[in-house]
Amino acid sequence: MMLFIVMKKVILGATGSIGSSLAKKLIESGDQVHLVGRDETSVSSLANELNSSYTTCDVLEENFSDKILSDLGDTPVNGLAFCVGSIDLKPLKLTKRSDFMQSFNLNLISATEVIKALADNLKKNKGSVVLFSTVAIKQGFPNHAI
């Protein structure tokens, strides 16, 4: 008798366009996912639709990854997709230091925190990490100073 271990892919930003599309594709291909989003109604609705587990948390909050770890428990994780992000368009002359710090915290600090939190689980299960970036890499936008 073969014993199969069910592993999950964790998707942060699961209720956005990229995150929800990725979750649906993974489910269609037979994978299981753990969805992470900041809006309880949206993430629980998507989790119900996909028959998936989920965590509600905001990546800008201190120790947000502890909630994800708690909800996952001993679940083996073999993939992490960071689909969180925003696009804040304004001319450079109107930007403030706080705009850059907010973007830095959202796009870099929160990604490194969740990677560190899941690193042992991912390593043990030969997992991988995907960090989604912005469309602005391919095509610039006016007033994309942040």
Locations of regions flagged by a protein language model:
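A short, exposed helix-loop element centered on a Lys and neighboring polar residues
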Residues: 115-116
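Rossmann-fold cofactor-recognition segment
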Residues: 49-63
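Conserved glycine-rich Rossmann-like NAD(P)H-binding loop of the short-chain dehydrogenase/reductase
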Residues: 31-43
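Substrate-binding pocket helix/loop in short-chain dehydrogenase/reductase
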Residues: 91-92, 99-104
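Catalytic loop of short-chain dehydrogenase/reductase
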Residues: 128-146
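Conserved NAD(P)H cofactor-binding loop of Rossmann-fold oxidoreductase domains
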Residues: 81-89
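N-terminal Rossmann NAD(P)H-binding glycine-rich loop of SDR-like oxidoreductase domains
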Residues: 15, 20-23
